[in-house]
């Protein structure tokens, strides 16, 4: 298994110019990129199309949630953009609408369970009863039932989630931090090797690469750790 197909670099930058520079710097070491709100609203959607047309894989992290018809219409347009992955919140009706809209397209739909920046207290403050792990597992089961391509969750829950999803669905894990690096605003973090061993199929890494003094060197260290974990 080639780790380059499983590392997703988060283009967490403010401008398309910065994103273009980073993609050029990382060259052939990276084949998969994530574009979220920050870049999307600064011309990043056109850039996402360009990346896909250049042969890169693009994970559009939009975390969709709306009425069924609106979600379905958005998914249909995103399919036409040539994206590889798309996130939506793991609510049953939204997932069902998205799956029906994406049918036959090859777009991998990912259900967002609980953000890796949140812990049990954050959920309690938001009015949820129970703990983050229980909610992640419940939403993972719902995502499987609705026919989603995978889910997004912390590597701390990946092993339990893998037992629910089986071997075919993707487990995409943000909050990845190489040993010794700053966790930043993430609360449920894990190293690349530990995340792979726990059952994650794809790792999303942003700041440890984007903010590194040498982004390409930082990427190569992470890829080597992932490759060793896969073998």
UniProtKB/Swiss-Prot annotation:
SUPFAM superfamilies: Ribulose-phoshate binding barrel (SSF51366). PROSITE patterns: OMPDECASE. Pathway: Pyrimidine metabolism; UMP biosynthesis via de novo pathway; UMP from orotate: step 2/2. InterPro entries: Aldolase_TIM (IPR013785), OMPdecase (IPR014732), OMPdecase_AS (IPR018089), OMPdecase_bac (IPR047596), OMPdeCOase_dom (IPR001754), RibuloseP-bd_barrel (IPR011060). Pfam families: OMPdecase. SMART domains: OMPdecase. It is an enzyme of class 4 (lyase). It catalyses: orotidine 5'-phosphate + H(+) = UMP + CO2. This is Orotidine 5'-phosphate decarboxylase. It comes from Allorhizobium ampelinum (strain ATCC BAA-846 / DSM 112012 / S4).
């Amino acid at each position: 298994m080639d780790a380059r197909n499983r590392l997703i670099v988060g283009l967490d930058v403010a401008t398309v110019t910065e994103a273009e520079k980073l993609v050029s710097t990382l060259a052939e070491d990276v084949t998969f990129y994530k574009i979220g709100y920050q870049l999307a609203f600064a011309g990043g959607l056109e850039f996402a199309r360009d990346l896909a047309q250049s042969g890169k894989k693009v994970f559009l992290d939009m975390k969709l949630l709306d009425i069924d018809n609106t979600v379905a219409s958005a998914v249909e347009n995103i399919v036409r953009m040539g994206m590889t992955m798309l996130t939506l919140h793991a609510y049953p009706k939204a997932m069902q609408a998205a799956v029906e809209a994406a049918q036959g397209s090859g777009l991998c739909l990912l259900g967002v369970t609980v953000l890796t920046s949140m812990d049990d207290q954050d959920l309690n403050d938001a009015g949820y009863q129970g703990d983050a792990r229980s909610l992640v597992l419940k939403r993972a089961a719902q995502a499987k039932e609705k026919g989603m391509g995978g889910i997004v969750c912390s590597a701390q829950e990946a092993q339990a989630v893998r037992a629910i999803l089986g071997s075919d669905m993707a487990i995409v894990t943000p909050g990845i931090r190489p040993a010794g690096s700053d966790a930043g605003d993430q609360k449920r973090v894990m190293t690349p090797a530990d995340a792979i061993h726990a059952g994650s199929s794809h790792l999303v890494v942003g700041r440890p690469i984007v903010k590194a003094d040498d982004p390409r060197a930082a990427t190569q260290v992470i890829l080597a750790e992932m490759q060793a974990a896969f073998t």
